[in-house]
Amino acid sequence: MVAPGRMVTSSRRIGRVTNKTKLIIYRGSDKVDTSAAETVLWDQEAGGAGKDSNKHQHIGATGVESGELLEHHLQAALSSASLLHSSNKPSSPKSVKEAPAAALNYHIPTPDATGLVSDTVFSQLYQRTKYVEPYNFIRFSDTVEESSCGWGGLGYCMDDADERWLNDFNSKAEGSSGDVKSDKEQGRGMRVKGKDREKEKGDAPAPLVISEDMFEYIMGVFEKYTEENAPMLHTDLSLLPPFSAVENMFSTPISPAFLPSNEIPKELGDLKACARMARNVYPHWKSRREQRQGKSILPQLNYDETNDNDPYVCFRRRDIRATRKTRRTDNFSIEQFQKLQFELRSAHALADRVLTREREKKSLYEAEKELWEARWKFFETKRRWPSLGMTSDEEHKITGRPTIVPPIQIPSLSGQTPLTSGQSSSHMRKRTDKDREERAQRERYDAQRNAERSGILSGRSNAPDALKERLQALQQKTEEMLARKKEQDAHWDDSIDSPYQPLPPSNSVHAFRSLFVLDPCRAQCKDSETGNEILHPESFRIRRGRGGIVRLDRRTSIYSHRRGIQPTSPSEYPTWLFPDIAPRRSEKKRPRSIDEVEEEMQEQSPKVMRKDLNETWRYDVDRGGAVGVGMGLEEDYDRVIIDDLEAKYIRHRISLLQESDCAKLRPDNYILDQTREALDAAADAKPPPAPIFQKPPAPQPNPQLLAAHLQQQQMLAQQQQMEQFQRFQLMAQQQAMAQAQAQAQAQAQAQAQAQAQAQVQAQGQGHPQAHLQTHPQGVPQPNGVNSPMPNGQQMLPPSDGVKQLKLPPHAVARLGAAMANANANANGGLHVLQQQQQQHAQTSQQ
């Protein structure tokens, strides 16, 4: 309540009451007129306090939130309080008469705070000594629920019903343990031996007493197991787990992951006793669950906020706090934190990389150590067994120093006939293999001599005889395999010796024509300046460009010359060996004047320029293919480039041609001769001898068997025709017999009628016209016999529903013949039958 000076009236309104508004507080000893005081309400007008004017708009005029105005008990309490307040107001401020006290019809129960507490009770509840928190007070961040949990972090807390059941169970267990009487109390005891006494003492069960902590642990395990395995138990009580499903949680060690604290309580003790306790507690837990209709025994808080009108929702969100706008200070602090985070991450990444580098160094040192130890063991083995020998590769593995490669040496070609590329490569390969074999034999011989010398000096051999024999056998086997391999590869070229395979020239290269073709005399010409032989003469090509323009392409000449003596360095050998393809002065597009200063040519030495140009154009296919030893030119890929000016080659050109030289210029008819010989040999060849084992000839068909087979087939066909004819004949006979029987019956009836007419005529001849009038015409009889008509014609017999068969022409002919025979037979039989009937009639008349 506020002072009278701050009272809110209808004519004067005060400012909005907030947490910063200063209010006068009245104590119990102050005299305050409660009837004159008024309740201060929240100011909801828009012009209240600026930016906070809309902060408490959800507070109603009664001081209650708008969401709680729908609760009926709160509305009843507010209306009752307003009625009580209006009834207690005096009629006028000056009246002293007190109104009768009215009781609240409905109120919200709250603790009574109107009375005074006695000094004795106050001194017991509130001590005068002030509590001082110790310095070593233990602080932790666990919540109240976590702190009040039982064993294993299970949050089950026993209530009054559990306490009553536990007290009854413990009292019964303690009472039952004292009810067992001894043999002396029951009467004269039996004499029992010492072992039996110990057995009886062991058989007596110990009293089962369950502590409160143990009871809460067992109930908590039941609740957690049911919550995980039967969450919908409140919908169907049949899902309640039996004790057999939960018994393993007590008879065997429980998993720490099952408990909320992830720790097994140390106070459990014996598992057998724990299982017995759980077996006794299970019926009580089951009954409690059934009473709760499958719900948890301990009531759970309702956190479901889907229904806003539910008053039992816990921790309901009253209002949504508006997010504050970001300020500059906040941005600055965020940037500082981000910068600090980036620096820490960079430092961590750098440290991680340093650690990785050191680990790699450690692994590298360990690998080098292992390699050094392996080399040392290998060296010790070689030193201990000298007979094994030492190759260049093994020496390189031990010392780690590469073997010095000797300078390249080309063997001199002797003889009168120049070698081709195939002969040269095979000769080089054989020479290399021979040198390798000689070197290996020499090393083995030296190793054997050293071993013998060391054995003679020491008096005994270092290597056992068995090991020597084994090594010799292995070496011999290896040599045999190498020799066999060499024989198999005698007619093959190893690509390892010349691994470079030049690309085939393009079609445009073949279109060039050299000057040798145009002017054969120019083929013997040499360079006028140097006198070198021309390897690749000038060539031209005519092609047609765009717009029909005819263009002439040319290629300069390539000369072969070797400058100086044969070099010994491998780096200088290609320059001396390969042909020079640098252009000459005569190959320029236009001649230079004598007075022109060649400053740009003096900047770089001609030797370096020539070397660079040769290396650049050596493998150019368009230029003329790969040129060099073993690589060939575009005209002849099997040609070896050599120095034509050498004395051993030039002597073949300066001398006159011999008969053998002319024979070499003629075309080789070797292939034609071989073909002719093969044809002659095939014509004169003898027939091949008969093989020992021949495939038996196919059996010839027997004409008699074929004739018998054909005759059998004809007989089968005739038999089938006869069977078909007999079947048709049988059908015709059946039809003829049926017709004959019908005709016989008709004739018998006709004779009977004739006899009856004769008798009538004999009895009375006065009525000759009666019979004629009754049958003036020949009427067909019921039996189907045709009666004669006055004109002498006969009527066709009715079909009587018989279906007519559609037969082929040959069958119709055969059937007609059969019908004729049947009719003849039937007529003969009918004639005989008529004669018999006439004889019978004559005998009857007589």
Swiss-Prot record:
Entry's family note: Belongs to the enhancer of polycomb family.
Keywords assigned by UniProt, alphabetized: Cell cycle, Coiled coil, DNA damage, DNA repair, Nucleus, Transcription, Transcription regulation
Compositionally biased tracts (Basic and acidic residues): 180-203, 432-452
GO BP, one annotated term: DNA repair
Designated gene of the protein: EPL1
Coiled-coil positions: 434-490
Places the protein is found: Nucleus
Chain residue ranges for the region called Disordered: 169-204, 391-466, 587-607, 682-702, 759-804
UniProt-listed InterPro entries: Enhancer_polycomb, Enhancer_polycomb-like_N
Name of this chain's protein: Enhancer of polycomb-like protein 1
Compositional bias ranges of the Pro residues kind: 686-702
